[in-house]
Amino acid sequence: MTPAETRTPDHLTLALPKGRILEEAVTLLSRAGLPLTMPEKSRALRHEFPGVTLLELRNQDVPVYVDLGVADAGIVGKDVLLESGRQVYEPVDLRFAACRLSLIREVGAAGPVQRVGTKYPRATREYLNARGIPAEIVKLSGNIELAALTGLADAVVDLVQTGSTLRANNLEELDVLFHSTARLVVNRAALKLRRDRLRPLIEQLRELVQNEPA
């Protein structure tokens, strides 16, 4: 029996990432009819609302919780979803938290790219393989740009929003791997078990997104 099957059909468990996406996600879900409010700042990681349990997770863990049925649905960036490799249902592009995953190098740097630093080894490997670049990939956790500035790597692959951090550190984008926005993801078993709750939520979110000004 999966975790999704142990809960009552009328109760939803949602996985949302801590940080920049959380507030926009809660606001959008509330507009879609769920009785949610922004959780108070505390050490609590699980928040209870009428008919809904909200789990605050690290970005990378949202697809895992949804795929394994601990959460019925969640919201996560497309970049995280692709890197996870998890096979979850992705019904709605929510069109916020827009950014791009880019290949970045110090301005004026010359020579071949032999080592690449990144938090996204899966996406980076696919990109390099497709172009026949046999570079070593170094998996890093934070301050990715520093790898290019210190010589740890010849280039880095990281998310870019405005590009201001790159300009401030004499870095430039060489190529864009893909563009990313926040996505609604749903556990496939939960979609059947909680159809009466998840289908209306999906349709309401689609309508809200379509009616947002471009």
UniProtKB/Swiss-Prot annotation:
Its main location: cytoplasm. Keywords: Amino-acid biosynthesis, ATP-binding, Cytoplasm, Glycosyltransferase, Histidine biosynthesis, Nucleotide-binding, Transferase. InterPro entries: ATP_PRibTrfase_cat (IPR013820), ATP_PRibTrfase_CS (IPR018198), ATP_PRibTrfase_HisG (IPR001348), ATP_PRibTrfase_HisG_short (IPR024893). It is found in: Cytoplasm. Transmembrane segments: none annotated. Heteromultimer composed of HisG and HisZ subunits. Belongs to the ATP phosphoribosyltransferase family. Short subfamily. PANTHER family: ATP PHOSPHORIBOSYLTRANSFERASE, ATP PHOSPHORIBOSYLTRANSFERASE ATP-PRTASE. Lacks the C-terminal regulatory region which is replaced by HisZ. This is ATP phosphoribosyltransferase. It comes from Deinococcus deserti (strain DSM 17065 / CIP 109153 / LMG 22923 / VCD115).
